[in-house]
């Protein structure tokens, strides 16, 4: 696991003592590509970029950067599941979504209501849970979820949510921002809990993950590996 906050990181180390918890920025980690089977996270949201020479040319906002880097870290067929800003799916410029679609299939997405994190983080932002499965090879296809689309009520949102209203855990509406601009948000439904809605929504997400088979070369490398001689100096 990776946790930037020292307190949260130490708590995680106590909770998961058999696991390695790195207390550092995600951009500072040096995990090899195609190393993990699955990456799960609640990525930071923000309208700012993070410095990483490998990704700087893409000008990713921080939440999009976390998704892109996670996809590189998992093996083909592996799954990335993240909570991210609704901006990943709803921004006007589709470049980030095209980048992700070239590398992964969107298994499904769930749009959360604007009060989902009100209790824990005192924030009313709209967020999504996205599920990606990494492709074996890069694709040039342009799936519908790359684009925006108007809902039946006339709200411009990601085509996935316009076509799958059952994955929106609330009702689309607009609200005024601090600058007086009208912004699309998701008002929570009455008479049903978020937990109940989530249980129903995840039933619509389907995917298959298989165990990675090691190649003959990788098996041979494991066989011939020997420990270093402690008497030999490492210059």
Predicted features along the sequence, with ranges:
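Hydrophobic/aromatic interaction determinants used to assemble and anchor large protein complexes
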Residues: 11, 228-235
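Short catalytic/ligand-binding loop motif for oxyanion handling, primarily in non-cytosolic enzymes
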Residues: 47-50, 89-92, 140
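Short glycine-enriched, charge-decorated loop/helix-capping segments at active-site entrances
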Residues: 53-58
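Flexible loop residues that form catalytic
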Residues: 44, 114, 135
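Conserved S-adenosyl-L-methionine
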Residues: 1-41, 46-48, 60, 85-86, ...
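Flexible, glycine-/basic-rich loop-and-beta segments that form/coincide
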Residues: 119-220
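Conserved Class I SAM-dependent methyltransferase catalytic core
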Residues: 2-11, 59-118, 125-132
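A short acidic, often aromatic-flanked loop/helix-cap motif at beta-alpha or helix-coil junctions
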Residues: 28-31, 115-119, 177-178
């Amino acid at each position: 696991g990776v946790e930037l906050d020292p307190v949260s990181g130490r708590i995680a180390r106590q909770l998961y003592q058999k696991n390695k918890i790195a207390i550092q920025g995600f951009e500072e980690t040096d995990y090899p590509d195609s190393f993990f089977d699955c990456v799960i996270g609640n990525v930071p949201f923000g309208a700012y970029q993070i410095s990483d020479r490998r990704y700087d040319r893409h000008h990713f906002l921080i939440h999009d950067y976390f998704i892109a880097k996670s996809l590189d870290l998992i093996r083909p067929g592996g799954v990335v599941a993240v909570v991210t800003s609704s901006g990943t799916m709803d921004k006007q410029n589709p470049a980030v979504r095209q980048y992700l679609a070239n590398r992964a299939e969107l298994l499904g997405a769930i749009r959360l209501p604007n009060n989902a994190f009100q209790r824990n983080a005192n924030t009313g932002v709209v967020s999504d849970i996205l599920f990606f499965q990494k492709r074996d090879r890069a694709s040039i296809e342009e799936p519908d979820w790359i684009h925006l689309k108007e809902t039946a009520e006339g709200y411009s949102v990601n085509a996935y949510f316009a076509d799958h209203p059952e994955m929106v855990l609330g009702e689309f509406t607009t609200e005024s921002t601090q600058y007086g601009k009208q912004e699309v948000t998701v008002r929570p439904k009455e008479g049903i809990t978020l937990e109940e809605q989530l249980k129903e929504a995840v039933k619509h997400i389907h995917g298959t993950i298989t165990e990675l088979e090691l190649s003959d070369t990788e098996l041979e490398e494991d066989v011939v590996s020997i420990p270093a001689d402690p008497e030999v100096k490492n210059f």
